[in-house]
Regions:
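Intrinsically disordered, low-complexity, positively biased terminal segments
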Residues: 40-169
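Contiguous, non-catalytic segments that form substrate-binding/exosite surfaces or channel walls
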Residues: 28-44
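Short, mixed-charge, low-aromatic patches
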Residues: 11-18, 33-36, 84-92
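Conserved active-site alpha-helix within GNAT-family acetyltransferase domains
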Residues: 2, 7-26, 128, 150-167
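Residue-level detector of alpha-helical recognition elements and their boundaries
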Residues: 21, 28-29, 92, 144
Length: 169
């Protein structure tokens, strides 16, 4: 079965008409000193091309278990990252057994690491990606990113005094 999703220009209006928000978008800002530092995961992170199959397969696995995350067909992939390919990097976390379990799409600009998307299938990948971010600490003053509402960031940090914004999406 198919169903339609739309982003309303007026949430109160659409609620009066019987529609509801199914997901939230969370953004965060973390100072470089707040990025987790004592992480030593057994896997590794590799930068890959935009057409890498592990990248797209990981998103499909994540979408299958995450509320509000849509599967992306070829057109959706092209539209979502259309203007980003030249400026951003795709980095995949692999376990010690070379199994991909997480990725992040990011760019570094004006001493800020911008995370466009970070997904992980397990705790090891989550920590491994944060370890990768920490390895860039000499290049950045802060991390700004987007995250799925079901994946809180502040709870994971030693210093959880960060800025998080939650908006309907």
């Amino acid at each position: 079965k198919s169903f339609a999703l739309l982003y309303p220009y007026s949430i109160p209006l659409y609620r009066r008409l019987g529609w509801e928000i199914i997901s939230n978008k969370m953004t965060y800002v973390i100072k470089d000193t707040q990025v987790p530092q004592k992480i030593r995961e057994p896997g590794y992170v590799r930068r890959v091309a935009w057409d890498d199959q592990d990248f797209k397969l990981l998103h499909g696995m994540f979408a299958a278990k995450t509320h509000g995350c849509l599967y992306r067909n070829k057109l959706a992939w092209e539209e979502y990252f259309r203007w980003d390919e030249d400026d951003t990097v795709v980095a995949i976390y692999y376990t010690a057994k070379d199994v991909p379990t997480g990725y992040m799409v990011y760019m570094i600009s004006s001493d800020i690491l911008h995370v466009k998307e970070m997904i992980y299938l397990d705790r090891e990948a989550q920590l491994g990606l944060w370890e990768y971010i920490h390895k860039h600490d000499s290049m950045i003053d802060e991390v700004r990113g987007n995250n799925y509402y079901s994946e809180p960031i502040a709870f994971e940090l030693d210093d959880s005094d960060i800025k998080e914004t939650i908006r309907p999406y």
